[in-house]
Amino acid sequence: MARKSSLAQAAIERKPVLLRPQLNVPRMSGITALPMERRPLPVAPSPSAKPELPARSALVCHAAAASVPLPNSDSAPQPNVLLAKIRAIMFFAWSFLLSLPLFVTMMVMAPLVLAFDKYRRLAQHFVNNLWACASTAPFYKVTIIGRENLPPPDKPVVYVANHQSFLDIYSLFHLQRPFKFISKTSNFLIPIIGWSMFLTGHVMINRVDRRSQLKCLQQCRDLLAEGAPVLFFPEGTRSLDCKMAGFKKGAFSVAAKAGVEVVPITLLGTGSLMPSGKESQLRPGQVTIVVHKALPPNKNADQLCDAARQAVASSLPPELVGSATEMAPDEQ
């Protein structure tokens, strides 16, 4: 009892101990915590918690900086582009299949045509027109404005038109006129279609060969003298941006020397259906051909050129009319 009382007396006399608050800081070996600073400590994530993802805008910025496409981004082929590619494949396949029996027909007729209609070759033109109209019918519509301005089929004239697309020739065949057009030499080597161009008597040219150009112009004058109309694309080649470039004087010097009329033609829509350089795509749409009034014969080729270009430009939207002095580059 004496021992217990002494312990109780000691407990009463003991001074109170002040308890210091302890920080919930994990102990780490080799690191001494600062006693006077209270910093928030990171909380370890729960294994079941999902990591927070940055916003998509941040992903877009990082992906753009790194040039890495995002899933579902615009770098993936768009459905309309895929559809345009499928349409182009179908168009060329259909056109080629149509050309097979028609080419055989042209081969059979060739001896008679050369014997009795060497220059105009009207029978071959009839086959060409049939082929072109049947090729385009399932894919786009061609509307002709100013058909009353077309001269008779047997009248020798110079047709001039703006050049936007591979489809220009297909579309112009809808005019049902037996014109000869000028095309680069390599096109005549295309199986079936190029051979058909040769049988029809179209004119080949190497645009970077001066002698070939002079020979082409002389051949056009000979055709006009024999009563065959001729079609020129005075820009010289297709426009990459659909803007009409300056006209070269070759077609108008031929018309001036032959003393024939010049018929300006405006093509609308072919460049949007199948742009130059994108022949692997065929977009939906329609083509409009505007036939302007014929320009009377004129011995001044420069005046004919200016008047024809103004007529063609009059039916084009202003944004598709380029500078008259800006010439398209020559190509082989």
UniProtKB/Swiss-Prot annotation:
Comment text on domains: The HXXXXD motif is essential for acyltransferase activity and may constitute the binding site for the phosphate moiety of the glycerol-3-phosphate.
Family membership noted in the UniProt record: Belongs to the 1-acyl-sn-glycerol-3-phosphate acyltransferase family.
Segments carrying motif EGTR motif: 235-238
Pathway listed: Phospholipid metabolism; CDP-diacylglycerol biosynthesis; CDP-diacylglycerol from sn-glycerol 3-phosphate: step 2/3
Annotated GO CC locations: membrane
Organism per entry: Chlamydomonas reinhardtii
First-listed, main subcellular location of the protein, grouped into a coarse class: membrane
Pfam family, one: Acyltransferase
InterPro entries for the chain: AGP_acyltrans (IPR004552), Plipid/glycerol_acylTrfase (IPR002123)
Keywords linked to the UniProt accession: Acyltransferase, Lipid biosynthesis, Lipid metabolism, Membrane, Phospholipid biosynthesis, Phospholipid metabolism, Transferase, Transmembrane, Transmembrane helix
Protein name as catalogued: 1-acyl-sn-glycerol-3-phosphate acyltransferase CHLREDRAFT_174358
GO terms (BP aspect): CDP-diacylglycerol biosynthetic process
Topology of this chain in the membrane: Multi-pass membrane protein
Transmembrane domains' residue ranges: 96-116, 185-205
Enzyme category, top tier: transferase
The protein's role, per its UniProt record: Converts lysophosphatidic acid (LPA) into phosphatidic acid by incorporating an acyl moiety at the sn-2 position of the glycerol backbone.
Localization annotation: Membrane
UniProt GO MF annotations: 1-acylglycerol-3-phosphate O-acyltransferase activity
